[in-house]
Amino acid sequence: MQWGTSAACDKGDTMTTTDIRRANDRARTRTDWLDSKHSFNFGDHLQPGNDGHGTLVVFNDDRVAGGGGFGVHGHRDMEIVTWVLKGRLAHQDSEGNTGELYPGLAQRMSA
């Protein structure tokens, strides 16, 4: 299965490769409240050589249904960016801090 298309561009002494992964070509996880498309290896979806891009190891497109969401869980040594395109997202961290995100806002969390 081909997960994307690659194109090489000659930029002087170096070659730059672009790997385009269309939404329908990415691995997908679906539950009753989540539709997630994974750009890199994630969970049970493993493909040799698709381990990320440098230090970026997870880049998921998560669609969360109203009333759904991730339960309390920890993070370590991560920078997490959440960007809401539609609707609202409530967030609470392990220290009890809360916030709400809506379109036009992004959240960056260091954990």
Question: What does each model-found stretch correspond to?
Answer:
Residues 95-110:
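Short acidic-glycine-tyrosine-enriched beta hairpin
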Residues 68-75, 92-94:
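Short histidine-centered beta-strand/loop micro-motifs
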Residues 2-71, 101:
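A short, N-terminal "cap"/entry segment at the start of jelly-roll beta-barrel domains
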Residues 59, 75-90:
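Short, conserved beta-strand element in jelly-roll/cupin
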